[in-house]
UniProtKB/Swiss-Prot annotation:
The ternary complex containing UFD1, VCP and NPLOC4 binds ubiquitinated proteins and is necessary for the export of misfolded proteins from the ER to the cytoplasm, where they are degraded by the proteasome. The NPLOC4-UFD1-VCP complex regulates spindle disassembly at the end of mitosis and is necessary for the formation of a closed nuclear envelope. Acts as a negative regulator of type I interferon production via the complex formed with VCP and UFD1, which binds to RIGI and recruits RNF125 to promote ubiquitination and degradation of RIGI. The gene is NPLOC4. Gene3D superfamilies: Cytidine Deaminase, domain 2 (3.40.140.10), Phosphatidylinositol 3-kinase Catalytic Subunit, Chain A, domain 1 (3.10.20.90), Zn-finger domain of Sec23/24 (2.30.30.380). This is Nuclear protein localization protein 4 homolog. PROSITE patterns: MPN, ZF_RANBP2_1, ZF_RANBP2_2. The modification N-acetylalanine is found at A2.
Amino acid sequence: MAESIIIRVQSPDGVKRITATKRETAATFLKKVAKEFGFQNNGFSVYINRNKTGEITASSNKSLNLLKIKHGDLLFLFPSSLAGPSSEMETSVPPGFKVFGAPNVVEDEIDQYLSKQDGKIYRSRDPQLCRHGPLGKCVHCVPLEPFDEDYLNHLEPPVKHMSFHAYIRKLTGGADKGKFVALENISCKIKSGCEGHLPWPNGICTKCQPSAITLNRQKYRHVDNIMFENHTVADRFLDFWRKTGNQHFGYLYGRYTEHKDIPLGIRAEVAAIYEPPQIGTQNSLELLEDPKAEVVDEIAAKLGLRKVGWIFTDLVSEDTRKGTVRYSRNKDTYFLSSEECITAGDFQNKHPNMCRLSPDGHFGSKFVTAVATGGPDNQVHFEGYQVSNQCMALVRDECLLPCKDAPELGYAKESSSEQYVPDVFYKDVDKFGNEITQLARPLPVEYLIIDITTTFPKDPVYTFSISQNPFPIENRDVLGETQDFHSLATYLSQNTSSVFLDTISDFHLLLFLVTNEVMPLQDSISLLLEAVRTRNEELAQTWKRSEQWATIEQLCSTVGGQLPGLHEYGAVGGSTHTATAAMWACQHCTFMNQPGTGHCEMCSLPRT
């Protein structure tokens, strides 16, 4: 039997060992490599040198001995799609940077924009330390890299987490320019397809067993700032708690933009808050199934918006006369409870961040968490968070549980016959000041949290118009605030704007026009949404002259009576209850019938 040798093959996914013989041909060896890495026979290239010289081809009949490949040698594997330079990839990554991931993934616009930016921190000449002319540079004024920790720590306030794109620049820096950079998602599951043993719980091996996880503070964050466009967006959301005392939940709709206060930073700008069906009490929230969720996302997309996060209240009134609230979330209690961390992780897994540097095509998430809670001054504050990628993996693979009696603690599940769970550790300091490693049973959730600054602009921004008598928000029937044509008629009659675009530019009104059961406009509202998105009054006037809006005006007049100035959207007055009690709506076809009739004039069905 020929003497066996072991050849190491390095790929973007790591190094694997291939057992071969000295007399084995190159073609036979490449078949083993293809099987080990899961490639097609022509889906990769293997080179003797890292600089892609000395390619081993399948057409060669030479043995490994003749190719001077010895026991323990390291060969280099490159997938075919990455074997040569790609102009498409080079347009979206820093110069000289070759990646091993999913080059066909379409990243978000903000990611494409930031990947083309220089990102360096330029400094002016220091009059005291610089000893050179105005055109020279020295260590005191040379531009800094966006990931410079000393610079970030000396900002006011200090930045604990560099931006995600600064982190990418750090990985792609150095002599090798990040030649083998690949952002791999953590997996807590047993790898499938291992044929060397029985499936779990009857067998496991080092090939399919997931690695143990040691929780570390994540050095970067995918979003660096949350900004509400104006105070009205947040105040209308808080009105529910002010009127009921119950906690409330909402989805943040907005867009991702550049955050210029941090090198290569990303900001989540919130333009509107959608409130799904829910049951809230003073200390709990229960989300109900939302049949309109997909429609809301579609309408938001046509308005140039997307779901960027979620928000909930945790408010307890302390002194109703002073209007103060209890300061309950701090370093002595918790910032996010374990249940909230798990919920945030689930949301982030449902909204992954598209990334070309990851073999999976996604890495982390830009989905943010906002909490309306009491601050140190006993006033309402908005706090922003995300959970780490490690937390996302633990939640995705169902390895993390909340603790019932301690909201600040989570619990890593133990392995069972149904599920293998890798060991999860975290580092702590004992009473002697020594660093120790603890098993995450239980686990302080502060190891999973990334804080994000939450702000309001000095100069408010208004994607949607602000009215003194706004259209009711959806799913607030418990307050007596319903979305129907009576409330629409009232809104139109009380609106003081003479510009139709300003009147119709209300996120909740647009959702009602699309989702109402009497006359949904999902197929005919695209022109109006485009007018709102581009702030084009001419397009809005064109849509106003359509049959659909004429029908809506007729319904409003019928339901709310003859409202003076309905078509001008500027007059106030008229009784809105004149005809409501007299006319009746058919339960079968919703046609408004005249009083005194027992059958519907449209469908001829009985009234009851």
